[in-house]
Every structure is written in C-alpha cells, then in structure tokens.
Amino acid sequence: MSQSCRMFCGFMSSFVGWIGLIIATATNDWVITCKYGMHTCKKMDELGSKGLWAECVVSTSLYHCTALNQILVLPAYIQTSRALMVAACIAGVPSLALVMMALPCVKLANETDEAKHKRAILGGVLILFMSLCGIVSTVWFPIGAHQEEHLMSFGLSLYAGWVGAALCFLGGAMMTCCSGGGAELQQQPHNRFYYSKHSGTANSMPPAANHAKNAHV
C-alpha cells in the first residue's frame, strides 16, 4: 500500500471515529439499568438508560428523561467522562484539519515535504489524544454506573463510543507511523544523477566525487 493510500485511509478512519465520538457524546443511551428482569422492569416502568447529560425511563409507552444538571452533586465518573468526551470532540476539528492539509493531494503555496510531514505527525498525535479520551470515558462510565446502581447491559451510545475510539486510534497510528519520515527527505538529494560533458552518460556518484573526476578529465 502506497504512502498516499495509507494517509487517506488514516484520515477517513479518523473522520468516521470522530463522528462516532460525537454521537456517543450527544446521546444518552450509554448504559441500561434495571433491578429486575427486562420484562418486569418494562412493566413497572423501572427500565432506565443513563448517559452523560440525562437519565431516562424507558417503557413500551413512556420515554421520559431527567437532565443531569446538578454539577456539584454528580458523581466523579460522570463529570470526568463529560470533560474527556467534550475535549475529544473539540480536538477533532484542528486534528482533522491538520491531517487533511497533510494529504499528498492537497498542495499549499511554498510548502516543503518536511512541513507536510510535521503537520501529519501533529494531527496524528491529536487524534491519538482523542482516542485516549474516548477509551477512558467509555470504560470508566459503565464501571461507575455499575457501582452506583445495578447495570443490566450496555447501550448503543457506548458502542458508538467504543467504535469511534478504536477508529481514531487506528487513524492516529497510521498518520503518525506511516506518513513518511525525515530520513527519506534527507536521502533525496543524494539520489540525483549527474552527467559528464565528455561521456554523456548518467552517473549516480555523489556530487563531490563526480565533480573531482570531471576536473581531472
């Protein structure tokens, strides 16, 4: 797989992962809570779902949510998960912009390959930071919810967060490790061909040795 293809795949993976993190942050179906069986809880209207921003009651004829806006009394796992997920969503804007400008198909005026490489590395590091925030939040939240009240199953929002964090990790790793290195850029001048006026044939000798040879001819 060529470098351009790897970078494009890393960008697309990071973009889809960022969308997954946004969906997980905005929705409240992180965990499903119930003290009894699923059928019993639905009949008694005690089947609930909990997210970062609200706690809902779910039944066949009712879906009512209560906002979790009492910041001072909220558990630490909810407040920390909120902060990490919001930070991941915000960091997605500059990181994806950097990665997009580092793609080989995007050309900026008076831009060197070294500057493009540094931009790809910085964008990849920010995407890995997004992945770390998503992983910590989506792992800590269900553990905290289970300790606070009986956890029955995981919600769709939590799965979206897991998928988003995994895709961001994959995309960030590809952008950081597969975007080409400075060593390749440094080797480019030494691979040039020099031509002698007398022989007219290509010579791949280093510049200093080739010039010395032409001086003695």
What annotation goes with each model-predicted range?
Residues G10-T25, L84-V99, R119-P142, L158-M174:
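Alpha-helical transmembrane segments of multi-pass membrane proteins
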Residues C65-N110:
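Amphipathic alpha-helical interface segments within eukaryotic helical scaffold
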Residues G144-H146:
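Juxtamembrane "helix-exit" motif on the non-cytosolic side of transmembrane helices
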Residues T27-R82:
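A surface-exposed beta-alpha-beta supersecondary segment
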Residues L52-E55, V86, A97, A115, ...:
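Short C-terminal domain-edge/linker segments immediately following a structured domain
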